[in-house]
């Protein structure tokens, strides 16, 4: 039969590229699970009353090439002015060797958060380097492995200051008036929910205020002034006030470390170490504190430990501080950090080294000095005598200056009374400075760059002598040996080889949705039209961004069944926080601000209670029945008991137990009956798209993990995006922004992140995914995700009991394998199985969540039948190994499971085990071998001997 032109055009070609099993393989798997078709399987699993009659209308699929061309045209509407706005964002030069070998490399961007350290040593080393950079530049003892952005880090610093303060009755937090406005905005949002009073005043007046538990200062003020706060910090410390200082990585190369001046906490953005502005993000924040406060620090910390053979190995330390363990008592709710961006900054420091960084910082400062000298020579006045890279210039005719700047395609900071702000960066040249003279002075000014350079080189006093750094930085060998591109390329490759990412094998982590991050989706993020825009540039310069964001928002509205979407949250956890704040403010608008009870099922992800606590709510736990579903009787009782103060319920759908609960609509109705709102966690949205939707189910607000369902890669632990969808009555209460007016905002709510649209530069990834999949492709993706999970469950259920199932014994898009009976019989644990899977070439499933002693498996739709079968065969082979232990063939204390993973050096070492080397490292005929570089880590040693800076170089060799 002759094919039609439409068939030959094959506009849905990407659907077949994204979805792993082809039609024939899908039918094989359907036969294995006993279903006739994808629609029949979905019909059996998803409750009838929540199934959509037709898929959401998000358009037909486009080919990769058509979608790229369409997005390129949209990006072309952005105007690439040279931005000297500053305010925490500058243009950068990302070294091409890092661009090609990390940012564009799936070996780096498709990895997961390093909870399994044995398969994560490469990015853990890069993160340890990031911590070392932070320690050297801040002068403090402990550093985290990144936070979401600078403003979030400021809010975390405030919360930490309260936790560690000895002034228990103090409830006021002082913020210096020249911090960045977006930082103050986010701090105020957080302070409101915690009940703190925020005082904003000139830093010199910090001592005038009583009952202050913490103070936030900024070393280089928002308008450029360098402050020597050593005397003030000393006086504040005498009063037992916790002092936090916001700092700039590049400025710290030349300026004295705030830790050396007595600061307790130092934080800031690492953006200018090689990470493009990207219209606001993603960017990594750095965070450091004194050793005495280490157990109160937010975020992840990479620590040096030992493996089972006594060799140095790295791991995430002190995880008991995190939300997946401590729930509402966690230090923060940060589930996603910014690993990929922290590692770019880390490798930027490695590549340039201390000499290169000082050259860059000195060049920026020299050009700023030249600009300042020329302007002063022509009679213009500078607001500040001491500066690093930013000048605040008083101008008589501000409108004329701004008009000349616009004509020259230059952005200056324009929100300062009778003055303009100018921030230079590593991309600034002498030609740029000459152009700035023309903009600020008009025509024939007669200034000569070379002459000015000679003058300032002989006598520069723009940095106070007391503020000049007098100690060495980055002395560790890792920052002093990889300065040629060849060496750098090989170093990065050596790190990459240590890790297991999606470019090598399936990552079957439950509740994580480790699906394909297609190359066509990733390409646009490095386009300069998207990468080079300042988040506070005039809106007419970002029309392409606004069109793309508007289209993506419209698609997400249709896919979720909500009425509006807010793009600001930088992670799923931050989305939860933003959604709960919207609920809180909604109740307050109805004079029901007393409603503060948040119902959370016992099965919930730990981020839920941590977010509720952060939003100022009290958590009340709702029981689950023996099948893992929400206990409706207990829900009704709790809702009625707390009816007067009920704020909301947080529920995940499909449930965290991997089933579609039949009573989800009834759950929503009960909560609404007693005046509460329904927060539906979007972590499992990959099993809803095109089949049902939160809004259709009856929820009021959800966050969407764009780094799960909508293909933004996990980056080894970030970036992420957690936009929230809301019903119309909550739309006025989503986050706003103090610097940029967000279109459609009816009221001005506080911000939750530094940039108005969060990590805007990675939104093209989700735009591309939806555009290339279309309505039918998105539905098919959800259906195949469900098929893949049920195929695994059906083939493994006789070897490993599936803990929870729904109707007809089916699961949703993931399944929980119960290891507890095996452990009771044999002593082999879920940890042993997880580590043994490494020998088979797999990342482990999610361990002991949501139920201790289990493994939760989520294959996603992107894995083909061959990879699923390989995983199933590995799990069955491991079950056979467990039976060998049970039968006494191998002793419990010495077998391939408890000794896993095995490393290459064991092949040539003395062998005294009761199983062969072949069984150890090539089990069940494994051919495409992944080699871990360390054996199982000693977690207890790592936490008891916390060490978070670089180890001797010999340990890397």
Curated annotation (Swiss-Prot):
Database matches in InterPro entries: GcvP (IPR003437), GDC-P_C (IPR049316), GDC-P_N (IPR049315), GDC_P (IPR020581), PyrdxlP-dep_Trfase (IPR015424), PyrdxlP-dep_Trfase_major (IPR015421), PyrdxlP-dep_Trfase_small (IPR015422)
GO cellular component terms given for this protein: cytosol; glycine cleavage complex
Gene3D superfamilies: Aspartate Aminotransferase, domain 1, Type I PLP-dependent aspartate aminotransferase-like (Major domain)
Top-level taxonomic group: Bacteria
Swiss-Prot/TrEMBL keywords: Oxidoreductase, Pyridoxal phosphate
Cofactor(s) required for function per UniProt: pyridoxal 5'-phosphate
GO molecular function: glycine binding; glycine dehydrogenase (decarboxylating) activity; pyridoxal phosphate binding
N6-(pyridoxal phosphate)lysine modification, residue list: 708
One BP annotation, GO: glycine decarboxylation via glycine cleavage system
Pfam assignment, any one: GcvP2_C
Function: The glycine cleavage system catalyzes the degradation of glycine. The P protein binds the alpha-amino group of glycine through its pyridoxal phosphate cofactor; CO(2) is released and the remaining methylamine moiety is then transferred to the lipoamide cofactor of the H protein.
Family, per entry: Belongs to the GcvP family.
Protein name listed in UniProt: Glycine dehydrogenase (decarboxylating)
Source organism (scientific name): Salmonella dublin (strain CT_02021853)
Primary gene name: gcvP
């Amino acid at each position: 039969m002759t094919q039609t032109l439409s068939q030959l055009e094959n506009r849905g070609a990407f659907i077949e590229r994204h979805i792993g099993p082809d039609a024939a393989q899908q039918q094989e798997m359907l036969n294995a699970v006993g279903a006739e078709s994808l629609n029949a399987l979905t019909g059996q699993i998803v409750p009838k009353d929540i199934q959509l009659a037709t898929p959401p209308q998000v358009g037909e699929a486009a080919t990769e090439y058509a979608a790229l061309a369409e997005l390129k045209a949209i990006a072309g509407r952005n105007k690439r002015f040279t931005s000297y706005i500053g305010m925490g964002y500058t243009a950068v030069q990302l070294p091409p060797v890092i661009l090609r070998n990390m940012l564009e490399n799936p070996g780096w961007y498709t990895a997961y958060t390093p909870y399994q350290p044995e398969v994560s040593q490469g990015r853990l080393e890069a993160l340890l380097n990031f911590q070392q950079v932070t320690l050297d530049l801040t002068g403090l003892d402990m550093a985290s492995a990144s936070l979401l952005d600078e403003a979030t880090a400021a809010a975390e610093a405030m919360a930490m200051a309260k936790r560690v303060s000895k002034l228990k009755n103090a409830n006021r937090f002082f913020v210096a008036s020249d911090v960045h406005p977006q930082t103050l905005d986010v701090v105020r949002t957080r302070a409101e929910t915690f009940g703190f009073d925020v005082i904003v005043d000139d830093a010199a007046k910090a001592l005038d205020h009583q009952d202050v538990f913490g103070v936030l200062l900024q070393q280089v003020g928002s308008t450029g002034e360098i402050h020597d706060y050593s005397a003030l910090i000393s006086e504040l410390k005498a009063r037992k006030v916790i002092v936090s200082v916001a700092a700039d990585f590049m400025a710290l190369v030349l300026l004295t470390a705030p830790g050396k001046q007595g600061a307790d906490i130092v934080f800031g953005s690492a953006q200018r170490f090689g990470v493009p502005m990207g219209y606001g993000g993603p960017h990594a924040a750095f965070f450091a504190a004194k050793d005495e406060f280490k157990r109160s620090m937010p975020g992840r910390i990479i620590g040096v430990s030992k493996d089972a053979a006594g060799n140095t190995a790295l791991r995430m330390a002190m995880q008991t501080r995190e939300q997946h363990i401590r729930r509402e008592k966690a230090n923060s709710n940060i589930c996603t950090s910014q690993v990929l961006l922290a590692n770019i900054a880390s490798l930027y420091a490695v590549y340039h080294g201390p000499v290169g960084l000082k050259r860059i910082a000195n060049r920026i400062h020299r050009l700023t000095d030249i600009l300042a000298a020329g302007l002063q020579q022509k009679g213009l006045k500078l607001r500040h005598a001491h500066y690093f890279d930013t000048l605040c210039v008083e101008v008589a005719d501000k409108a004329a200056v701004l008009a000349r700047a616009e004509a020259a395609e230059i952005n200056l900071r324009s929100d300062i009374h009778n003055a303009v702000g100018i921030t230079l960066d590593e991309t600034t040249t002498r030609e740029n400075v000459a152009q700035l003279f023309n903009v600020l002075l008009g025509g024939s000014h007669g200034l000569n760059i070379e002459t000015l350079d000679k003058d300032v080189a002989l006598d520069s006093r723009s940095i106070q002598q007391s503020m000049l750094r007098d100690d060495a930085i980055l002395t560790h060998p890792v920052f002093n040996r990889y300065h040629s591109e060849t060496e750098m390329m090989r170093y990065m490759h050596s790190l990459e080889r240590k890790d297991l990412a999606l470019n090598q094998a399936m990552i079957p982590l439950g509740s994580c949705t480790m699906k394909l991050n297609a190359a066509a989706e990733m390409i646009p993020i490095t386009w300069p039209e998207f990468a080079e825009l300042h988040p506070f540039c005039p809106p007419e310069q970002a029309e392409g961004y606004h069109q793309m964001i508007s289209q993506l928002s419209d698609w997400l509205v249709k896919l979720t069944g909500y009425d509006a979407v807010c793009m600001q949250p930088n992670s799923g956890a931050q989305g939860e926080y933003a959604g709960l704040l919207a609920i809180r403010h909604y109740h307050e608008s109805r004079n029901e601000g007393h409603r503060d009870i948040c119902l959370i099922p016992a099965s919930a992800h730990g981020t839920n209670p941590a977010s509720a606590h952060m939003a100022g709510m009290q958590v009340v736990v709702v029981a689950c029945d023996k099948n893992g579903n929400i206990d409706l009787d207990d829900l009704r009782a709790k809702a009625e008991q707390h009816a007067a103060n009920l704020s909301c319920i947080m529920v995940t759908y499909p449930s965290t137990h991997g089933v579609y609960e039949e009573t989800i609509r009834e759950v929503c109705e009960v909560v609404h009956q007693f005046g509460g709102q329904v927060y539906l966690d979007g972590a499992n949205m990959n099993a809803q798209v095109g089949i049902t939707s939160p809004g259709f189910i009856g929820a009021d607000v959800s966050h969407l993990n764009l780094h799960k369902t909508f293909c933004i890669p996990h980056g080894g632990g970030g970036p992420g995006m957690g936009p929230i969808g809301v019903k119309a009555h909550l739309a006025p209460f989503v986050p706003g922004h103090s610097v940029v007016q967000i279109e459609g905002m009816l009221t001005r709510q506080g911000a939750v992140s530094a940039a108005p649209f969060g990590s805007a530069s990675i939104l093209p990834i989700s735009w591309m995914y939806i555009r290339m999949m279309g309505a039918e492709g998105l539905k098919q993706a959800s259906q195949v995700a469900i098929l893949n999970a049920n195929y695994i469950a059906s083939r493994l259920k006789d070897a490993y009991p599936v803990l929870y199932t729904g109707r007809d014994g089916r699961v949703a898009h993931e399944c929980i394998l119960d290891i507890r009976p095996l452990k009771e019989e044999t002593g082999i644990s879920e940890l042993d199985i997880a580590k043994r899977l490494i020998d088979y070439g797999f990342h482990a499933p999610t361990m002991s969540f949501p139920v201790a002693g289990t493994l939760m498996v989520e294959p996603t739709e992107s894995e083909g039948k061959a990879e699923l079968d390989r995983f199933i065969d590995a799990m069955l082979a491991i079950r056979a190994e467990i039976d060998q232990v049970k039968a006494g063939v191998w002793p419990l204390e010495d077998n391939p499971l408890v000794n896993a993973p095995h490393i290459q050096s064991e092949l040539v070492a003395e062998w005294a085990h009761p199983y062969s080397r072949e069984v150890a490292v090539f089990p069940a005929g494994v051919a495409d071998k992944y080699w871990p570089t360390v054996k199982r880590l000693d977690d207890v040693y790592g936490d008891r001997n916390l060490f978070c800076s670089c180890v001797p170089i010999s340990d890397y060799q």
